[in-house]
């Protein structure tokens, strides 16, 4: 892996990184992750990451959000609402394209 932008002198934003250089340096942000690696009864290599924007109820206490399409590939549910309202009302869930429906259904429950 090559050098990070910061190592090359690139400054992004006005604030520096937090003490752990992690998304969880932001107060209230929570991150959960699960990885599945198995060979029986069938081969599975997958995972899911969920990011909660704060400790409250994201459906009632929405946060500002924006989107950016980097390469035009991938599945994204909720982009229209973020683009129209500029608000996020759920956790951000990152998973494979084939698991996005299950992630959406689980998050909506």
Task: For every predicted segment, state its role.
Residues 1-109:
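Alpha/propeptide regions of enzymes that mature by internal proteolysis
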């Amino acid at each position: 892996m090559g050098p990070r932008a910061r190592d090359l002198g690139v400054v992004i934003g006005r604030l520096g990184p937090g003490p752990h250089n992690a998304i969880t340096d932001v107060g209230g942000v929570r991150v959960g992750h699960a990885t599945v690696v198995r060979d029986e009864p069938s081969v599975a290599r997958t995972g899911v990451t969920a990011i909660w924007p704060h400790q409250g109820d994201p459906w009632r206490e929405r946060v500002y959000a924006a989107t950016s399409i980097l390469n035009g590939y991938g599945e994204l549910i909720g982009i229209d609402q973020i683009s129209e309202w500029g608000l996020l009302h759920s956790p951000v869930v990152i998973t494979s394209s084939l698991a996005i429906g299950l992630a959406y259904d689980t998050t909506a429950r």
